[in-house]
């Protein structure tokens, strides 16, 4: 990957992940480190691999250009034709990443893709070819964490089969504001139940110990986005104020504290 005719520490599987990461960091330029801080969306719906456009870019950069010229290695999947084509395209993208100076592999993430189609917008997608399940609120209605873990284990296998390594879920927000449009994507308003369901979700996707078969869960939206002011969502300009009526901040924080104590590696703050 480093293209110097020898195997560097970060390329050598005989070293620990910590040793490999530290060696890689020492070799990275400031620009390459900055590139790790971005997480733009990409669509795999069509076109050649160099024509797949970045949805967030007003300049029309191809994903190939973002990888090789702007050092961006994290991408959020927005749409896919089918699992087979998705796997092929993501493998092609990884081949492009190998051509970068350090050959840092890409980390591809996705919002939920397994829900029964309902037009989830920014909250969830329903991609063809993947198994179909209820929303988080539907799972919560079962009151059975073991069912949630079973779903997460199956979804993990499907994610891995196409090259997705980070799940931009679950939502551990508490649905205490009935006007908020994303309540269906939560585990409900009970902090204790939401905590239990979040742990089961995490255990199914990533396991108690992170390994090569794990899919990381990015629990969201820290520190608790359920009680949006007037029910307005902060994805939009009109929903910029986060409030906690009744001094209930600690109550909304509870599922996130439990997730962190359960070996959470990545977390998504609200906007």
Model-derived segments and their meaning:
Residues 1-271:
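Glycoside hydrolase catalytic-domain context in secreted enzymes
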């Amino acid at each position: 990957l480093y293209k110097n005719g020898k195997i560097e520490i970060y390329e050598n599987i005989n070293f620990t992940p910590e040793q490999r990461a530290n060696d890689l960091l020492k070799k990275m330029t400031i620009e390459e480190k900055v590139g790790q801080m971005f997480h733009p969306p990409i669509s795999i719906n069509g076109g050649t691999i160099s024509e797949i456009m970045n949805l967030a870019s007003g300049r029309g950069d191809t994903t190939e250009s973002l990888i090789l010229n702007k050092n961006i290695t994290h991408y959020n999947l927005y749409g896919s034709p089918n699992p087979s084509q998705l796997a092929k395209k993501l493998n092609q993208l990884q081949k492009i990443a190998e051509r970068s100076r350090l050959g840092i592999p890409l980390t591809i993430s996705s919002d939920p893709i397994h829900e029964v189609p309902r037009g989830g917008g920014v909250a969830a997608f329903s991609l063809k070819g993947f198994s179909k399940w209820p929303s988080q609120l539907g799972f919560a209605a079962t009151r059975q964490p073991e069912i949630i873990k079973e779903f997460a284990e199956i979804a993990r296998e499907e994610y891995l089969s196409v090259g997705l390594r980070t799940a931009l879920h679950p939502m551990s927000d508490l649905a205490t504001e009935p006007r908020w449009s994303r309540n269906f994507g939560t585990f409900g308003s009970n902090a204790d139940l939401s905590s239990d369901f979040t742990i089961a979700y995490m255990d199914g996707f990533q396991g108690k110990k992170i390994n090569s078969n794990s899919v990381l869960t990015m629990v969201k939206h820290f520190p608790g986005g359920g009680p949006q002011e007037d029910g307005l969502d902060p994805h939009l300009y009109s929903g910029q104020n986060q409030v906690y009526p009744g001094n209930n901040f600690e109550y909304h924080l509870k599922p996130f504290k439990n997730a962190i104590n359960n070996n959470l590696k990545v977390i998504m703050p609200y906007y």
